[in-house]
């Protein structure tokens, strides 16, 4: 059995880590570099760096900050936000990214997924999918959750894998920042059907929620921000808890 992963997420805006609720009401969560170093020392399995306003503002990811982080951490680093071409992905890799995450750009131009996979390998391509429960189904949203696409989540998840995505980062906008737990219904549906690793995101508020993301949602990795940024729990504490619960995890 492959070990499950704990992945802190740095949502970055204007050179600072921020955290909101349902993609709104952003509050400061500290220095990018200090948080990155902290998670490296805490033995996080990976780190995600998302420039959350890059796509909205139609600009590149803040690569100078990515480089600073990559020079200080020794765990895999995924970079997203404004990655809308092979060239921009290449720049991210040159600045220290191990993987790139695409979201809005993949919906606009799905062939970008294939181009990235062919150039850099599927293992380096993460497709982030931001979703909302709209009653009859879960719909995909883009531009940091501001634009509905009409796409069905399950159909889009299968499509991105067909195109070459090596991993899916699935974020429930309904749960984001609420600390009420992951949406394990759609998480399980995606995790058990797509054939690539799925990262649970949106809603982790305690260690039990992480456990449920693995045991009920069947996720391969759990991404969290609030509970770690504001030191409600540590990554080490989370891993010890999960191991006690019988989850295969790297300590």
From Swiss-Prot:
Cellular location(s):
Cytoplasm
- Report quaternary structure and partners: Heterodimer of HisH and HisF.
Molecular functions (GO terms): imidazoleglycerol-phosphate synthase activity; lyase activity
Which GO cellular component does the record give, naming just one?
Answer: cytoplasm
The coiled-coil regions, if any, are none
In the record, the note on similarity to other proteins reads: Belongs to the HisA/HisF family.
Listed A to Z, the keywords are: Amino-acid biosynthesis, Cytoplasm, Histidine biosynthesis, Lyase
Role description: IGPS catalyzes the conversion of PRFAR and glutamine to IGP, AICAR and glutamate. The HisF subunit catalyzes the cyclization activity that produces IGP and AICAR from PRFAR using the ammonia provided by the HisH subunit.
Q: Per its record, how is this protein called by name? A: Imidazole glycerol phosphate synthase subunit HisF
Q: In which pathway does it act?
A: Amino-acid biosynthesis; L-histidine biosynthesis; L-histidine from 5-phospho-alpha-D-ribose 1-diphosphate: step 5/9
Reaction catalysed by this enzyme: 5-[(5-phospho-1-deoxy-D-ribulos-1-ylimino)methylamino]-1-(5-phospho-beta-D-ribosyl)imidazole-4-carboxamide + L-glutamine = D-erythro-1-(imidazol-4-yl)glycerol 3-phosphate + 5-amino-1-(5-phospho-beta-D-ribosyl)imidazole-4-carboxamide + L-glutamate + H(+)
List GO BP terms, alphabetically.
L-histidine biosynthetic process
Q: Which residues participate directly in catalysis?
A: 11, 130
Specify where it is mainly localized: cytoplasm
Q: Does the keyword Magnesium apply?
A: no
Classification via CDD domains: HisF
Q: What is its EC number?
A: 4.3.2.10
The record's listing under InterPro entries reads:
Aldolase_TIM, His_biosynth, HisF, IGPS_HisA/HisF, RibuloseP-bd_barrel
The organism sits in which domain of life?
Answer: Bacteria
